[in-house]
Amino acid sequence: MTSNHYLGAAAAGFIVLLAACAAQTQQSADGVTIGDSDLGGVVTSATGPEAGVWVIAETTDLPTKYAKMVVTDERGRYVVPGLPRASYNVWVRGYGLVDSPKVRTAPGKLLNLTAVPAPNDAAAAQYYPAIYWYSMLQIPPAGEFGGYTRIPKDRTQADWLKQVKNIGCIGCHQLGQSSTRTIPSAFADIKSSEEAWVRRLQSGQSGEQMTNQLAGNFGGAPYKYYADWTDRIAKGELPFAKPPRPQGVERNLVVTSWEWSTEKHYLHDLIASDRRNPTVNSYGPLFGSPEYSTDNMPILDPRTHKVTTFKMPVADPSMPEALGPGHAASLRPLAPSAYWGEEKLWDTRANNHNAMFDKQGRVWMAATVRDRPNPAFCKKGSEHPSAKVFPLEMSSRQVAMLDPKTMKYTFIDTCFGTHHPQFGYDADNTLWLSGTGPVAGWVNTKVFEQTGDAARSQGWAPFVLDTNGNGRLDEFIDPKSPIDPSKDKQIIPGSGPYAVMPSPVDGSIWYTVGVFGGPPGFLRFDPKTRLSEVYHVPAPYFGIRGGDIDKDGVAWGSASSGHLASFDRRKCKGPLNGPKATGDHCPEGWSFYQYPGPGFRGLGENSAESSYYTWVDQHNTLGLGENVPMSTANLNDGFVALKDGKMILLRIPYPLGFYAKGFDGRIDDPGAGWKGRGLWSTNGDRTPWLMEGGKGAKPRAVQIQLRPDPLAR
């Protein structure tokens, strides 16, 4: 072949390559560039470009319902990147708008969309996050506490706020979305709204727990306030505040969601990776924790969009269900549901509350393996080293491990209860648990792998303050005895450990404590000395729920007062042990950052946000940087991050009513930029049918990613 032939062939190949590139990308006159798997265009209304609104693309063509959501830039431009090949419904949603008509299309097209301004404030308010409606709830003024009204004498205004926020009602549900700010039609014939609320909260397998909280703990007084709230809304009262549209970096979010589990079963959490090593399980499946709802663990493969289930076993198949006394759900509905009648929905034995990956890619769960009474090695008279110090009679949940490679499920019978698991940073890969009651509890997973002996692999120890100040664990007095400066003192930290957080700095173990009773705060346990320190939330702040720790050893938590709380032990000025170091000795270690959103009126500056859990992005899995604390924003339809002193909202705009109890971060490909990393979570409301979509709606797993700009592909 001559050189001219070579040149001719090369030129032809170059032309083909150019044609292929042209087919792969398109650019609009507005500067929107898309590829074959993208959608892009401009959103406008009669008033011009619509900035900071969402474009939502959803399909049912894949193995499970799938949606991807983005935010428009300052010129109304958008790009929905990386859509699987399918046919999509696409529409616009935003504050000040009503949903636009859905347009049917496929990826690879430039698609301009027309937004629809809301005809009035009432129509616009239907799309507001729940907090804008829930903040309309009236709170009894301070003068109504102290035994002068129906409110029991021993209940304070802070107790009331904890109940109507993240320690009580918002601990299981988002209140303020459409389903909860109205009365179900099934109860419409009840003669008074207050009686309708009494009946409503008796419904289903949580009816007993809800009734005990409001009628038992608060004398039934809250019913009146909830009735007044829904009455005012039914008469046309609207939120007194309006939500701002996403601004700045909030417009760079890409949210992807998949339906999973069933319309009758909720999920408490999901797990994606090892929080210490977030490249573990890269591009791998997500595992859901269905808690009280079912033994069927949903597993989502985000690459194929397929959802499968694994039925979690228990060691004794004849054991009773993990429902009823000792649990936060009942065997049967207290009264028929407005949605499901007398049907019993929940039937779990495994009761998988929460899970964590280890560095080998195995899933370790806080899950029930047998009935509540403990085996003999846990009890008084046992030769187990921990039982000699502090015997334990029963536990309602233990530990299990699933190996996704083989799907082998292993039981680890613990004497202490479990709730949230977290791996430490030690050579033994110690698994630390919360929900352990009066003790710190752990499993040495290295020993368990070597021996398979659950008894030998576990340990526990009571929480003991070094009140004699000598730095050693000595003879200690019981929790009810007054301080003796010559001895140490055991404490029961209120309702016990709730969140658990091993420190990457010094190996100490931190917990949130006093969540459901007793003084709330953080507790530090030293595995080497077996000594504890406790730090109470200082007034005027109150309450705490989930928490985490950052790479500097600073503890962070979701405070009931509507704040992200932090505690830095390094700021303490006085002694950390001794007879005065009993919880109130270091207020200077605390800092508080108010969550976004309106507050309840009559209480001064506050936020009604009722965050369930806080997590620290130690490894920049989202893209805001390392060591960024984030909280579930349970009334703001998503999450909130604290970056450089500013709160950044990470909203899930669809379906309305997104409510999470936790989240995780994963780096699938460190070299793939924003596409290779993201946060993962799932809708965790106990009643999926209360979110947008109503009866038949399923929980959604979500991935949140952060682009460098709203048009990045």
PLM features per residue range, with description:
Residues H268-L270, F310-V314, E343-T348, F411-F416, ...:
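Surface loop/turn motifs at the tips and blade-to-blade linkers of beta-strand repeat domains
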Residues S179-A186, N281, G288-Y292, A322-L323, ...:
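Short, conserved, GDST-rich strand-edge loop motifs in beta-rich repeat architectures
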Residues E259-S282, E342-Q360, H420-D428, K489-D506, ...:
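Structural signature of eukaryotic scaffold interfaces centered on beta-propeller domains
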Residues N166-Q177:
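The canonical Cys-X-X-Cys-His
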Residues P49-E50, V79-S87, Y95:
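Short Pro-Gly-centered beta-turn/loop motif in secreted/extracellular proteins
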Residues T59-K65, S87, W91-G108:
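A short, solvent-exposed loop/turn motif at the edges and junctions
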Residues S45-D61, R85, Y134-G146:
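Short, ordered, surface-exposed loop/turn motifs in non-cytosolic proteins
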Residues T33, T60-G82:
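Short, acidic Ser/Thr/Gly-rich low-complexity loop/linker segments typical of extracellular
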